[in-house]
Amino acid sequence: VVRILTDSEIEGWGEVCPLGPLYLASHGLGARAALQQMLPALNELDPTNLSAIHAAMNASLRGHSYAKSAIDMACWDILGKDSGKDVATLLGGRLQESFPLYKAVPLGPSEEMQQYVVDRRSEGIHRFQLKIGANPYEDAERVRKVVEVTTSEDVIVADANGGWLLQDAMIAARLIEPLHGVLFEEPCKTLEECLYVRQHTSLPMILDEVITDVNTMVRAFNAQGMEGINLKISKFAGLTGSKLVRDLADSLGLRVTIEDTWGGDLVTAAVSHLAASTRPEQVITVSFMNDWNNEHIAGYQPRSKNGIGSVPAEPGLGVEVNV
């Protein structure tokens, strides 16, 4: 968690939470070290000047977008409080006040995954991310079981998190293709492999971990390799970079899932503002990470209800951190 204090006594809050050291090229100790490296270059800057902030961060440290994300988030919080506007308005305008959230379905026996979906649907959830990426035949059966208990109002994303070898990904794709309404996400660990799979399947493809910047996004699009992107804000150095990616995706006709690697109330607030400023038709689904945590630093706000997320209306991120 990052707290930025200003001369005008406005404070801004940001957060980053890597999902361990192996999921992406990020980790908690790395975030702390990167922040220590960058902070001296930021001390005298205007936090409402996001361009200057990013120029200073980039001049003091190459890469480490995830650490820069926490500073960027705090600066947007300050910009909103200083201008009296919520971050969604500053990101382009509030286009929706609420949006559908997804639940990740843990990898397990197909019957257990099926029952998990049945239970979550009874709570109002209609967006599901199925964790697969193991034996392709068993994975296809897992997806089939879930499809059996869902309808056209549900969105099913079969997400391998890059877990398959290319051959296994092709086997899984062939078996899943006949199932209705399934989106395929990140079958393999490299962009080249994912593009190969998309070129040999009719399943709509969402790419996540292999899209690390605008360049890889444009490359994947030009290769006709995806129909959607999983937009994790810390991958793109915060809301500033995420807005660029979101707007480019919209221009290219790509849908987006909006979330982050992990986080609490602050990450959830930032995600809610980016989602609220995105056209409803462009959004696949959204994740409120604070639903997955036991601890809360801002009163468990914003909070989901019956599978729906909403965005705060107060200036900045719109949440109050309990200090």
Where are these regions (language model features)?
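Short beta-strand elements
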Residues: V1-T6, Q301-S304
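Conserved, mostly hydrophobic/aromatic
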Residues: V2, E9, M38, I71, ...
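Metal- or metallocofactor-binding catalytic centers and their adjacent structured scaffolds
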Residues: L5-D82
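Conserved beta-strand positions in the central sheet of alpha/beta enzyme cores
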Residues: E15, Q129, E185, I206, ...
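Active-site beta-loop-alpha junctions enriched in small/polar residues
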Residues: L19, A104-P106, K131-N135, D159-G163, ...
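Metal-dependent enolase-superfamily TIM-barrel catalytic cores that perform enediolate-based chemistry
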Residues: T89-T201
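Shared catalytic-loop signature of beta/alpha-barrel
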Residues: H180, K189-P204, I211-I308, P312
